[in-house]
């Protein structure tokens, strides 16, 4: 930002003398012209002893405000500063002479202003351009450094562990494997807007570990503004380049699909996490089920919002339960502008779905920013595996952003929040089983690529407690059309079951091969 000299250069003489009077520096400034007076006063104000003395004499509210500025890196947007401290009254020479506001400041902002400890400028700070309140750099150098970062200062109280927990684990990754097999085995049609054909969407939804209710499926899933788990899954599949569209039909791309399927489960989950972090197609704010974002004259930055918020989540100790509302309140206290870095709350046209009035102004923070945080906690952060949540009266389907009390950061979430993949020594997967009734059972812990290959030559039957597929004539004909003979199917099943293929199943496949 600016030095004291740069800050004071454009001040009128009356304001410069008011600052000198407030700091008790009248005897050190004698120049008559504004430019010369600004140079003299800035030199006096920059004296380290004078700065330390001025800070020590500040009232507690002003010291707290100055510490907040230091903690923010020495600058914050003028709207954000005004919410904390109030506005500095402005007036010409006659008003200054009459009111003498430095003798009776009405708020902490005026105290710091007339002490020459802050300035105001239109500038670019941290990539954000706007009106900023700042501490001049030659003052900032002599102020105590912030003892904690914004994120570390959340200090959430502990909460008791809930009776029932929704464990996130690798559930979305398991459903991603289901998605890939579904696209491979079916003629999935997509319209120009990216929405799937209703019948395809319903068939895929049926196979998921957490299928959506029919009403939610018709209203949201697959749409560009759908705020449900299935919509996120489809968005991430597109972002990871798993398919292309040809003549309206989705066709799996072998290289990216195989690469993901053959990765270890922790790496698969991490790839989905990274795709969400970088996604501009998935705008979390516009996916909040109860909010409607309207108008084209404003734009939010979903990627920047995620990254700023995750800095705070990274300071939470994994495995410890906290109340959701305590986290929301802590973000409001310490970083309310996490998605509106300019601090302006009057330019985004957002309303609740059942109301016509727009939520303009900081007084609606809880209805917009708070709603976004609650959606992220119960939605993407949980679906992707970064948070476990309280399952009491709570589901994983389209309306699942309703009441929940507590959350905890998972071990893999802690690694991701630190910018690292999650390294874990997973136990060996349970074996795939083929039964005499031609059912094939694939445990959730099985390798994703093995399950994908099972799905290519079978018919899906169930996804819980294990994945269950059935060897059928229709499925074998589909596999044969893709170049997979019955002999290859038998060889594969023997390999993944350690040779335990029932004799009748083996004979049936051998007969088809001959």
Language model: regions and residue ranges:
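P-loop NTPase catalytic cores that bind/hydrolyze ATP
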Residues: 115, 206-254, 303-310, 371-379, ...
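Hydrophobic, conserved cores of late-appearing folded domains
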Residues: 154-225, 229-234, 239-242, 247-249
């Amino acid at each position: 930002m600016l030095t004291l000299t740069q800050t004071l250069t454009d001040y009128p003489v009356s304001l410069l003398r008011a600052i000198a009077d407030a700091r008790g520096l009248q005897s050190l400034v004698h120049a008559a012209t504004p430019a010369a007076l600004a140079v003299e006063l800035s030199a006096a104000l920059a004296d380290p002893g004078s700065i330390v003395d001025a800070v020590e004499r500040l009232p507690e509210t002003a010291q707290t405000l100055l510490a907040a500025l230091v903690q923010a890196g020495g600058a914050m947007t003028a709207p954000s500063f005004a919410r904390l401290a109030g506005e500095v009254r402005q007036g010409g020479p006659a008003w200054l002479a009459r009111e003498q506001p430095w003798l009776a400041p009405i708020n902490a902002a005026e105290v710091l202003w007339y002490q020459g400890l802050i300035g105001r400028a239109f500038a670019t700070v941290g990539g954000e351009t706007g009106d900023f309140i700042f501490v001049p750099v030659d003052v900032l150098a002599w102020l105590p450094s912030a003892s904690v970062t914004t994120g570390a200062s959340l200090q959430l109280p502990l909460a008791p562990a809930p009776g029932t927990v929704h464990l996130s684990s690798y559930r979305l990754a398991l459903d991603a494997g289901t998605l890939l097999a579904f696209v491979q085995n079916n003629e999935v049609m997509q319209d120009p807007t990216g929405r799937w054909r209703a019948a395809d969407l319903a068939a895929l939804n049926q196979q998921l570990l957490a299928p959506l209710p029919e009403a939610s499926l018709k209203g949201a899933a697959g749409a560009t503004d759908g705020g449900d788990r299935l919509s996120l899954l489809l968005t991430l599949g597109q972002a990871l380049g798993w398919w292309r569209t040809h003549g309206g039909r989705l066709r799996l791309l072998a290289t990216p699909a195989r690469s993901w399927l053959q990765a270890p489960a922790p790496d698969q989950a991490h790839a989905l996490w990274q795709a969400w972090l970088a996604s501009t197609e998935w705008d979390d704010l516009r996916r909040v089920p109860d909010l409607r974002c309207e108008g084209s004259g404003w734009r939010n930055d979903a990627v920047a919002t995620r990254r700023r918020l995750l800095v705070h989540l990274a300071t939470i100790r994994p495995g410890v339960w906290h109340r959701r509302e305590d986290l929301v309140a802590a973000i409001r206290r310490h970083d309310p502008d996490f998605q509106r870095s300019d601090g302006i709350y009057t330019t985004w046209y957002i309303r609740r779905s059942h109301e016509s009035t727009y939520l303009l102004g900081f007084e609606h923070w809880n209805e917009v920013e708070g709603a976004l945080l609650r959606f992220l906690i119960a939605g993407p952060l949980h679906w992707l595996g970064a948070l476990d949540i309280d399952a009491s009266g709570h589901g994983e389907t389209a309306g699942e952003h309703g009441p929940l009390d507590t959350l905890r950061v998972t071990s893999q979430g802690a690694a991701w929040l630190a910018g690292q993949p999650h390294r874990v020594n997973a136990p060996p997967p349970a074996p795939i089983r083929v039964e005499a009734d031609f059912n094939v059972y694939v445990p959730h812990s099985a390798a994703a690529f093995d399950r994908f290959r099972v799905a290519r030559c079978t018919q899906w039957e169930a996804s819980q407690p294990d994945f269950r597929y059935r060897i059928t004539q229709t499925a074998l004909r589909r596999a044969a059309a893709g170049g997979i003979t019955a002999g290859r199917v038998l060889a594969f099943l023997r390999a993944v079951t350690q040779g335990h293929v029932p004799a009748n199943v083996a004979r049936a496949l051998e007969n088809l091969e001959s």
